[in-house]
């Protein structure tokens, strides 16, 4: 849902530069964010926009944008937790920086990035006890990997593959799992704050709302 909110705005601005598109993505994903991972994704997009320095981006520029994305997302979260989308973003950024100077072409470069992202995602199952108990990887991290895989697919084919929704009923069976998780707040509340004051102590504000 978060990405869907951004797709419409990007589609209307296809002739814009990479920098312009990243700015549109940052704004659209923030306003359309759904859930914790959606909000973090919007901060990743914000970081990408901050990390890009011009209308075009070479591999080192892309790597810098990835790093800026991870750094921005970590700073935006009051209590960053490893084994989540944050870990996948950080380790993907580290991989991008590593491969940026290897003389690869665009497809090879992004293949390395996607492979690294998938490896990072696989490890999330063994970092968070809740994920290990359930036998699953982090959902937000998986979403980020899917976005990167989509970018790679477009680089390879130059085409966007539209996925049609299935109207065929499908019966599935699943075994319920009793997962014991120490979750204090079992719901997600989101709100946007329009800041009119010019000089605001952001850290003081965060410490105040953190109580609630």
Where are these predicted regions, by residue range?
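N-terminal loops that bind phosphate or other acidic moieties
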Residues: 1-212
């Amino acid at each position: 849902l978060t990405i869907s909110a951004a797709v419409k705005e990007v589609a209307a601005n296809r002739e814009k530069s990479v920098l312009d598109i990243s700015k549109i993505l940052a704004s659209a994903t923030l306003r359309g964010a759904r859930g914790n991972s959606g909000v973090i994704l919007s901060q990743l997009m914000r970081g990408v926009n901050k990390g890009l320095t011009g209308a075009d981006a070479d591999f080192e520029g892309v790597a810098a944008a990835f790093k800026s994305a991870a750094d921005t997302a970590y700073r935006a979260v009051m209590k960053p937790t490893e084994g989540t989308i944050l870990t996948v973003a950080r380790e993907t950024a580290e991989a991008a920086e590593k491969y940026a100077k290897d003389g690869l072409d665009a497809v090879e470069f992004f293949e390395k990035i996607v492979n690294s992202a998938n490896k990072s995602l696989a490890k999330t199952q063994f970092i968070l006890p809740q994920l290990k108990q359930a036998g699953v990887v982090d959902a937000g991290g998986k979403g980020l990997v899917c976005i990167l895989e989509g970018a790679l697919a477009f680089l390879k084919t130059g085409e966007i593959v539209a996925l049609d929704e299935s109207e065929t009923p499908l019966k599935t069976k699943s075994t319920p799992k009793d997962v014991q998780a120490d979750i204090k707040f079992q719901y997600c509340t989101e709100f946007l704050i329009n800041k009119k004051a010019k000089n605001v102590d952001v850290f003081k504000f965060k410490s105040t709302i953190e109580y609630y």
